[in-house]
A protein has these predicted regions:
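Active-site neighborhoods of divalent-metal-dependent phosphate/nucleic-acid chemistry enzymes
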Residues: 75-122, 156-158
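Acidic, PIN/NYN-like endoribonuclease modules and their adjacent C-terminal/linker elements
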Residues: 106, 112-159
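Alpha-helix/helix-capping structural signal
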Residues: 8-9, 44, 82, 123
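Short, well-structured N-terminal submotif of metal-dependent ribonuclease cores
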Residues: 1-41, 54-64, 140, 145-146, ...
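A general alpha-helix detector
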Residues: 9-10, 47-52, 86
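Short glycine/serine- and small hydrophobic-enriched flexible loop segments
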Residues: 51-54, 110
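Helix-adjacent hinge/juxtasegments
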Residues: 51, 60-82
Length: 159
């Protein structure tokens, strides 16, 4: 059992003004507690998240991001040459209109049997996993859980 975290979730976790910040905080908090098993992301998701943070929030936010990934206990899968080649082929074929990073995510999920996917892009990824969590997730929580998420969010995703 495991969950794969998409770029948008990790970006929203670090951008307190993002419309999905509370959902991202709740998803990551529950992922870290093992609700779906081990939380995974790929090295390409790390790169993509870092680029988004730099372009939208500046250098300080971008430079702070990779350290919390390891500190938080997220498992980062490094894209090797074979996975990169297969992802490039998927990207070139235009399968599901996936970007290169998204294609690597699909390949890792398939290879590892990851059944849950955290994303705010349900249109593109809604059928990629048995369990897709994202927008509105925080609304499904109890008041006590929402309070915990608010504390986690205020403490800040480590950055």
């Amino acid at each position: 059992m495991a969950i794969f975290l998409d770029t948008g979730v990790l970006y929203a976790l670090h951008d307190t003004a993002d419309v999905h910040h509370l959902d991202a905080s709740a998803i990551v908090l529950h992922a870290l507690r093992g609700k779906w098993g081990s939380p995974y992301l790929s090295s390409y998701v790390t790169v993509e998240t870092t680029l988004m943070l730099k372009s939208r929030l500046g250098w300080a936010a971008a430079r702070a991001f990779p350290n919390p990934v390891k500190e938080m206990g997220l498992k980062e899968l490094v894209v090797d040459e074979e996975t990169h080649g297969r992802a490039l082929a998927m990207f070139a074929e235009g399968r599901r209109e996936l970007g290169l990073t998204d294609a690597t995510s699909v390949l890792f999920m398939d290879a590892l049997g990851i059944g849950a996917f955290a994303t705010f892009d349900r249109r593109r990824f809604g059928r990629l996993a048995q369990d897709v969590v994202g927008e509105g997730y925080s609304k499904s929580l109890s008041d006590e859980e929402r309070d915990e998420v608010a504390r986690f969010s205020k403490a800040g995703a480590p950055s």
